[in-house]
Amino acid sequence: MTPVKVFGPAQSTNVARVLLCLEEVGAEYEVVNVDFTVMEHKSPEHLKRNPFGQIPAFQDGDLYLFESRAIGKYILRKYKTREADLLREGNLREAAMVDVWTEVETHQYNSAISPIVYECIINPAMRGIPTNQKVVDESAEKLKKVLEVYEARLSQSTYLAGDFVSFADLNHFPYTFYFMGTPYASLFDSYPHVKAWWERLMARPSVKKLAAVMAPQGA
C-alpha cells in the first residue's frame, strides 16, 4: 500500500496534529517538506493541494484534503481498530463528548494558548518580532479561565471525553507542547488534574515520538 503523504514540516503545530493521528493508528506515511522561504506554500502546485496556501495538505491516492482536524478525522476513520478507536463513533454518547471537547479545543483552548506561543516563541525566534506583552497577558488570563473548566472536567474523568483517550485530547498536544517551553508553563501547576492529564498524554509513544521531532535542536 502506498503511504499517505503529509505536506508541511513536522514542527508545524497543524502538521504535527495530523502526524500524531497517523502515529496513533500505525499508518505508513511520508512527510513532504514545504519550503516557506521560497514561498512554496503559495506555488500553483501546492495551491492544488490546499487552495488557501497553508499547511498541512494531505494526499491519499487521488484524494487531497486540507484542514488538520478534518484530516485527523479521516485518518482515524480509515484506520480505526478496536485498539485505535479515537472518535468513538460506535457509541453515540461517547462520540458526542468527543465532538464537544474537540470544539472546545478549537474555539476556547486554542484561541487562548496559541497567542502565547506565537508571542513568546514564533514571533521573536522566527520572525524577528518582539513579544507583545499585552497580548500575552490577556491570553494568559483567558487561558486560566479555560483551565478552570478543564480542571473541573478532569476531576470527574481521566480524559476530556470520558475515561478513554480520544481525538479531543490529542488535538491539544501541539500547542501545549510548545507552550511548555514558554515562561508561562507553570500555569498548569495550579490545575493538578489538568497537569496529570497532560503528563498522561506525554507518556504516550506517539506523543513521545512527535515531541522528539518538534523539540528545538540542542534541547
Swiss-Prot record:
Alphabetized UniProt keyword annotations: Transferase
Keyword Transferase: yes
Catalytic activity of the protein: RX + glutathione = an S-substituted glutathione + a halide anion + H(+)
UniProt-listed GO biological process terms: glutathione metabolic process; response to toxic substance
Leader sequence segment: none
PROSITE patterns on file: GST_CTER (PS50405), GST_NTER (PS50404)
Gene Ontology CC annotations of this record: cytoplasm
Domain GST N-terminal: 2-83
EC annotation from Swiss-Prot or TrEMBL: 2.5.1.18
Induction data: By the herbicide safener fenclorim.
Enzyme class, UniProt record, top EC level: transferase
GO molecular function: glutathione binding; glutathione transferase activity
Tissues expressed in: Constitutively expressed in roots.
Binding site for glutathione: 12, 41-42, 54-55, 67-68
Residues covered by the GST C-terminal domain: 91-219
Biological role: Conjugation of reduced glutathione to a wide number of exogenous and endogenous hydrophobic electrophiles.
UniProt cross-references to PANTHER family, sorted A to Z: GLUTATHIONE S-TRANSFERASE GSTF1-RELATED, GLUTATHIONE S-TRANSFERASE RHO
Family, as annotated: Belongs to the GST superfamily. Phi family.
Protein name (database record): Probable glutathione S-transferase GSTF1
Name of the encoding gene: GSTF1
